[in-house]
Amino acid sequence: MEATKKTTSITVQDVPVTIMNVDQRDYISLTDMARARTDAGRAADVIKNWLRARSTLEFLGTWEIMYNPNFKVVEFDHFKSEAGLHTFTLSAKEWIEKTNAVGIYVQAGRYGGTYAHKDIAFEFGSAISLSLIHISEPTRPY
């Protein structure tokens, strides 16, 4: 994904959250979202712990299967079978490299951190804070 990159920022509940546009796709900073829940030095741990969860892997795998024709399903199945074990660890970088995932993006350097497509970022937000749940459709009457 080394192409045209542009960053902007939005404020969510008084917390600045970076949005990186890569090849005309917006990726929201999971790192910034995690910093809102914990101290800056532990944001990466929050993301890694979220990635370890079986429900997270199932969501990510389903998203990638739907939107990424180059997703490596066999590698995904391996991660899914390991999820839940005490010895299972997974970083965003490892997920991307092993499965050819496009929904998560890792950036080193000045705007470094872990970024995700808005669908994935909203899922992450709801996992770390119920007040960050996003309703993407208008509320329907009962």
Regions found by a protein language model. Name each.
Residues 1-46:
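N-terminal intrinsically disordered, low-complexity, charged/polar
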Residues 4, 57-111:
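Long, intrinsically disordered, low-complexity Ser/Thr/Pro-rich regulatory/activation regions
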Residues 18-22, 107-112, 121-123:
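Conserved phosphate-binding loops in nucleotide/dinucleotide-binding enzymes
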Residues 31-34, 125, 136:
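Non-transmembrane alpha-helical segments in soluble domains
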Residues 37-61:
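Compact nucleic-acid interaction/catalytic patches
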Residues 116, 121-131:
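Conserved pre-motif C helix in the palm subdomain of viral-like polymerases
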Residues 133-142:
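Single conserved hydrophobic/aromatic residue that forms the stacking wall/gate
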